[in-house]
């Protein structure tokens, strides 16, 4: 039987719509068809997929405290990005705290964390620093304070490097934007922290808490970072 060339006007969409839909992210070896200057070619999905792989997310409402994620760190990836978007506590002037979790348990014993940060704000030239050597959490945000106004939410990235490692302390570093209670003064904060109780602890999750009340709005997205 002679082959017939399919042209734009003679292509029946049912060729695609009538086929079983893929209900997940394509595997790296799945193939797609593209047009390269008019020439059809096939390409493995691995060449075009993002290096950020969605793992989990939550949109916060009400008065949530703590916000917990279990089983989000695994041997599949050794780097993770936690994206915070307009995270707002219920009340002003509260500390926002990060803790690792091991299975279903929060790692929160005294004198097991250390953290350091520096920040600047839009109405001052001075740099504010915060450093703590023995704590039960990692405080994040400018002067460790969060504010409740929608224009004052915490946004930015927390980077988690190799949390499943048993040869280094579980640690984070972050780059965040916050603001004062009315949202007019912007704060930029960078910092780092580590759980230093045991090198052999392979953490599997984390939680964010407020020193009082909880979070009323905002979003947290977790991505695994594929190695290039």
Where are the model-predicted features located?
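Surface-exposed molecular-recognition determinants
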Residues: 8-20, 30-40, 44-228
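Cleaved targeting-peptide boundary
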Residues: 2-4
């Amino acid at each position: 039987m002679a082959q017939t060339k399919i042209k734009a006007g003679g292509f029946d969409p049912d060729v695609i719509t009538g086929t079983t839909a893929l209900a997940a992210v394509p595997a790296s070896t799945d193939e797609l068809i593209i047009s390269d200057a008019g020439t059809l070619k096939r390409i493995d999905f691995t060449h075009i997929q993002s290096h950020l792989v969605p793992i989990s997310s939550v949109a916060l409402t009400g008065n949530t405290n703590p916000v917990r994620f279990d089983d989000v760190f695994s041997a599949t990836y050794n780097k993770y990005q936690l994206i915070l978007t307009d995270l707002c506590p219920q009340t002003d002037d509260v500390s926002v705290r990060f803790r690792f979790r091991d299975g279903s348990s929060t790692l929160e014993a005294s004198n097991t964390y250390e953290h350091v940060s520096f920040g600047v704000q839009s109405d001052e030239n001075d740099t504010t620093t915060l450093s703590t050597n023995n704590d039960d959490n990692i405080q994040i945000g400018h002067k460790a304070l969060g504010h409740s106004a929608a224009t004052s939410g915490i946004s930015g990235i927390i980077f988690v490097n190799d949390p499943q490692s048993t040869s280094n302390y579980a640690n984070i570093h972050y780059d965040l934007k916050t603001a004062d209670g009315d949202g007019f003064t912007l704060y930029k904060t960078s910092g780092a922290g580590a759980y230093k109780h045991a090198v052999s602890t392979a953490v599997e999750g984390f939680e964010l808490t407020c020193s009082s009340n909880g979070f009323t709005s905002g979003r947290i997205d977790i991505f695994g970072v594929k190695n290039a």
